[in-house]
């Protein structure tokens, strides 16, 4: 491979250079093509991979498992109730045990410091499948999807608006990704939900080098004008008190992605993205409860937009697997 990322961890995007991120995206596209054409070569044969999930998941777990199987690796799934991490055994000790048995470890859980401890003490590549602070594998999938639907534009020629809760792990990772790849990113959210200033300061130098433009605004019209992509995420997380839901939903209502908001972009070819799961209809227990309680047509996005031709959310979901495969092959492959 032209770049050597072997034995590197994948904990957050700012640990990499723009060239390295582009390399991972190019590798993802090549691996995707190989899978579709039946020409994929297994480069993880004989490797054993541990998947630690302290938070449940559909896309991340399936992506890591299918990617590993495609490449000839074996996986062990360690679910939220399947380990002693933090209860009877520290992450430091867990890292030193698993590092003796496995060639690579994925972690999806809470504090960023936990995945960093795992990386520090395991002695094998560690991949961040999501923490409270960052979700780097999702951003890789998003960037690949944007390149596929960007009509030939490079990332540094693209404009994207991220609406809703921009202080979460997705907002944080988009800030890092946009800075690295020279993008025009608008974080369109209530001021209380803008990213921490500390993070914006951290990426400022990189953004200057790449020509990235990162803007925080409460003004929906200004934020979405002329963008190529509209992106949102769920407004509330399971486990938060119900009072927090009501307050958050009322605050976020102006940032819902609906048909009127798409029209405000002035771009008839604008695309809609979402990392999923999405509360767009009443076909889930939570979605039905939210619709009845708040009288809304969807929460962060309406069903009309979610099911429209503008929506590329399922291309995006598929690309989780191809980009995760690229990360594992680049850092662990033979």
UniProtKB/Swiss-Prot annotation:
It is an enzyme of class 2 (transferase). InterPro entries: Asp/Orn_carbamoyltranf_P-bd (IPR006132), Asp/Orn_carbamoylTrfase (IPR006130), Asp/Orn_carbamoylTrfase_sf (IPR036901), Asp_carbamoyltransf_Asp/Orn-bd (IPR006131), Orn/put_carbamltrans (IPR002292), OTCase_ArgI (IPR024904). The keyword Transferase applies. It is found in: Cytoplasm. Pathway: Amino-acid biosynthesis; L-arginine biosynthesis; L-arginine from L-ornithine and carbamoyl phosphate: step 1/3. L-ornithine binds at residues 169, 233, 237-238. GO terms for biological process: arginine biosynthetic process via ornithine; citrulline biosynthetic process; L-arginine biosynthetic process. Carbamoyl phosphate binds at residues 57-60, 84, 108, 135-138, 275-276, 320. Its EC number is 2.1.3.3. One of its GO terms (cellular component) is cytoplasm. It comes from the Bacteria. It holds the Pfam family OTCace_N. Its main location: cytoplasm. Keywords: Amino-acid biosynthesis, Arginine biosynthesis, Cytoplasm, Transferase. GO terms for molecular function: amino acid binding; ornithine carbamoyltransferase activity. It catalyses: carbamoyl phosphate + L-ornithine = L-citrulline + phosphate + H(+). Belongs to the aspartate/ornithine carbamoyltransferase superfamily. OTCase family. NCBIfam families: orni_carb_tr (TIGR00658), PRK04284.1 (NF003286), PRK12562.1 (NF009213). Reversibly catalyzes the transfer of the carbamoyl group from carbamoyl phosphate (CP) to the N(epsilon) atom of ornithine (ORN) to produce L-citrulline. This is Ornithine carbamoyltransferase. It comes from Pasteurella multocida (strain Pm70).
